[in-house]
A protein has these predicted regions:
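A structural "domain/chain start" motif
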Residues: 1-43, 47, 146-159
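C-terminal/domain-edge helix-coil "capping" segments
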Residues: 1-6, 52-57, 101-104, 110-159
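Sparse, context-dependent recognition of short Cys/His-centered cofactor- or disulfide-binding micro-motifs
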Residues: 6-8, 30, 50-54, 72, ...
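Solvent-exposed, well-ordered amphipathic alpha-helical segments
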Residues: 7-10, 14-21, 46, 50, ...
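Residue-identity detector for threonine
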Residues: 15, 24, 32, 37, ...
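Second-shell loop/turn segments in exported
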Residues: 32-40, 79, 120-131
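Mid-chain, structured segments of secreted extracytoplasmic proteins
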Residues: 35-64, 69
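Surface-exposed short loop/turn segments
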Residues: 56-105, 111-124
């Protein structure tokens, strides 16, 4: 999980989001089967996302804005020297004080490639690629959230 946590600089967010976001649920992930392949499970992604949102000053137990996360697809190679993984994750941010109006509904695709130089064992390269793709997806979400402008009467993404 710790390898999926966003550890970059603090971003700027709309003041309405500051310490005002809750994470309702994370679904769609799969548990790793030690006899088969590495996967991204709901708990690991949820933990990394919570840690990332907390570090950015966004997460709150009683936040007005609620984030639901659905892991739509995780594209993984079966074998190879370079392991490229792409996560497709849907994020739905709703305003619970406004009849659960949808503030943002985005599906983000993010890729990460782990090479032979990162790890000799294919199983470890796949795990690193999964974690890297998860982290890239969380980073892209934070970028979307930092572009979000919330006005009580109007909600939009800055261009």
């Amino acid at each position: 999980m710790e390898n999926m946590v966003y550890d970059g600089p603090l971003k700027q967010y709309d003041t309405h989001l500051a310490d005002n976001m809750g994470l309702t649920k994370v679904s769609g992930g799969e548990e790793t089967n030690p006899a088969w392949t590495s996967e991204i499970d709901d708990d690991a992604f949820s933990g990394a996302l919570k840690e990332s949102l907390t570090a950015q000053g966004l997460l709150s137990d009683n936040g007005r804005y609620q984030l639901e996360v659905v892991m739509v697809e995780v594209d993984q190679p079966m074998f190879g020297l370079d392991m490229a993984v792409t996560t497709h994750i849907k994020y739905i941010l709703s305003d619970r004080e406004n009849g659960n109006a949808v503030v943002m509904d985005e599906t983000i695709a993010a890729q990460y490639t782990a090479t032979l130089g990162d790890a000799f064992a294919a199983v470890k390269r796949l795990r690193l690629a999964n974690e890297g793709s998860g982290k890239a997806n969380i980073t892209a979400l934070l970028d979307k959230l930092s572009a979000l402008q919330i006005d009580p009467g109007e909600i939009s993404l800055t261009q």
